[in-house]
Regions:
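General small-molecule cofactor/ligand-binding pocket signal
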Residues: 12, 81, 107-109, 203-206
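A structure-centric signal for secondary-structure junctions around beta-strands
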Residues: 6, 21-22, 77, 217, ...
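Residue-level signal for pocket-adjacent positions within structured domains
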Residues: 4-6, 13-15, 108, 147-151, ...
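S-adenosylmethionine
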Residues: 17, 25, 29-30, 87, ...
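SAM-dependent Rossmann-like transferase core, predominantly class I methyltransferases
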Residues: 2-39, 45-58, 222, 237
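SAM/dcSAM-binding transferase cores
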Residues: 215-259
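A generic structural signal for alpha->beta connector loops
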Residues: 8, 37, 77, 103-105, ...
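Conserved SAM/SAH cofactor-binding pocket of Class I
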Residues: 29-125, 131-145
Length: 259
């Protein structure tokens, strides 16, 4: 059995279509999480890693804000729903959730984003999310991966697109809600344009580069309903002079064993 060990939880990493990866961990560590958040949605959860990171961060914040007295206490205070179109990934995520300290707050569901949206409408609950997050597929033009499940996890032509995510967010975010995504840097212009078309505005962007001499290859972009004239704009360098940078180690300190 392949197990990826973080400081406070473990992830079974055997069968999911998308394994634990740097992009996902960066999103989980860097996205904005508030102690006032109650309803969170992970779209394309894979192993469930980002949802687990969100749970850990929320309970740390809540404890500091005196929202809850125990790490697994007040289960009604936080609900994280994690969906994926791949049934095997959902089974693995559910197992990882069950083995975590926050198992009462995490739920894995086998559904596409469209199916999940329809189910929300069918329930008539008017449920809104304070945070939606995703590490969506991004290989629009590349050759399709040979294995179909991994193909769906990596390619927008067969799976989820950021356009769908933004359109869903426009309908299902709470008034103060945010959507956070990790994507290739070259998608920035189209991403922000499509967000504006859906009434969403960039308030924070983290530009990720592997080493100082290279241009950013990834962005973590965060949007809300509220206009922001000067979005927070930060550059993160992963490695410097052959070792992990201090800023990267600081960002991932609560998760990676080596940080």
């Amino acid at each position: 059995m392949s197990i990826f060990r973080f400081k406070r939880f473990e992830v079974i990493n055997d069968r999911s279509a998308m394994k634990v990866n740097t992009d996902g961990v960066l999103l989980g560590a860097a996205m904005t999480v508030n102690p006032s958040d109650r309803m969170l949605l992970d779209v394309g959860t894979g192993t469930g890693t980002i949802a687990l990171m969100a749970a850990q961060r929320w309970f740390d914040l809540a404890r500091n804000e005196n929202v809850g007295s125990r790490e697994t206490g007040m289960p009604e205070s936080l609900k994280i729903t994690a969906i994926d179109i791949d049934e095997i990934s959902v089974e693995e995520a559910a197992r990882n959730f069950a083995n975590s300290p926050w198992h009462e707050n995490l739920q894995a569901q086998h559904a596409s984003l469209d199916e999940f949206s329809v189910s929300l409408q069918g329930e008539g609950s008017g449920e809104k999310f304070d945070l939606i997050f995703s590490n969506p597929p991004y290989f629009d033009e590349s050759l399709l991966a040979p294995e179909q499940r991994r193909c769906n996890a990596r390619h927008t032509s067969t799976g989820l697109s950021y356009r769908e995510l933004l359109e869903f967010a426009a309908e299902h975010l709470s008034d103060g809600g945010r959507i956070s995504m990790v994507l290739p840097a070259e998608t920035e212009a189209a991403l922000t344009r499509h967000a504006r078309m859906n009434g969403l505005h960039l308030f924070r962007i983290l530009r990720v580069r592997t080493v100082p001499r290279k241009s950013p290859s990834r962005i973590i972009a965060e949007f809300s309903r509220h206009r922001c004239d000067e979005p927070e704009d930060v550059i993160l360098t992963i490695q410097n002079e052959g070792k992990y940078s201090e800023e990267y180690l600081s960002l991932t300190h609560d998760f990676y064993l080596f940080a």
